[in-house]
Amino acid sequence: MKSYIEPFIASKALSQNSQKAYRYDLQQFCQLVGERVNQDKLLLYQNSIANLSLSAKKRKLSTANQFLYYLYQIKYLNSYFRLTDTMKVMRTEKQQAAIINTDIFYQKTPFVWGQLISLLILELGLTPSEVAGIEVANLDLSFQMLTLKTKKGVRVLPLSQILIPFLEQQLIGKEVYLFEHRGIPFSRQWFFNHLKTFVRSIGYEGLTAQKLREQFILKEKLAGKSIIELSDILGLKSPVTLEKYYKS
């Protein structure tokens, strides 16, 4: 199984530092699990990282899950195995969610629909209903802008350069909506299922649309946006729901 580490790393667009981290984590994983993967060995690996910090544990689980999925794709494994963090983390009201490393969200994946849904939430802070309502006519990729029309009003949101290729790929053949079938928007359940499948494939099972939107809020606050500015970006009637993120 160790011989597949380098081909796996080569299949992903990673920086030099990320390659080193992936290589280190996977060498440890393979050393403990060995050449034959089964649930007992995976449980052994989970126990071996149980006392690490939450961020380190999440990173190792994510890396191992990506590798396991890769091995399943290339038919090295006959079954799809997956590691889950069974440790429950207790939080007090004073504790806030931490900003996660989102590099993996931009990497190549077979789950392109779920990926784009998650990126639109991460990059723009959209709700699932706002994502579903994106119309082709309101996307201007040349000027990198999205005009979002909702019952609350109209917002013009800038599109980052990194988001453009993902949008270009999915705009091909669309008639009315970005997410549609022959001009008819997909159902709410369709969005839920595709988002769930994608985040699970990259090791973030349980990461909901609400939590992804929270990541946008945390990053915008960190970038220096005031509570009023952020409220306007999100199209909120009042900044009250954002107050918990701005408490010292």
Curated annotation (Swiss-Prot):
Xref: InterPro entries: CB, DNA_brk_join_enz, Integrase-like_cat_sf, Integrase_catalytic, Integrase_recombinase_N, Tyrosine_recombinase_XerD-like
Gene3D superfamilies for this protein: 1.10.150.130, Intergrase catalytic core
Subcellular location: Cytoplasm
Domain Tyr recombinase: start-end pairs: 85-248
GO annotations of cellular component type: cytoplasm
Domain Core-binding (CB), residue spans: 1-72
One Gene Ontology molecular-function label: DNA binding
Keyword terms of this UniProt record: Cytoplasm, DNA integration, DNA recombination, DNA-binding
PROSITE patterns: CB, TYR_RECOMBINASE
GO biological process: DNA transposition
Active site: K149, R213, Y245
Function according to Swiss-Prot or TrEMBL: Putative tyrosine recombinase. Not involved in the cutting and rejoining of the recombining DNA molecules on dif(SL) site.
Annotated family: Belongs to the 'phage' integrase family. XerD-like subfamily.
Name of the featured protein: Tyrosine recombinase XerD-like
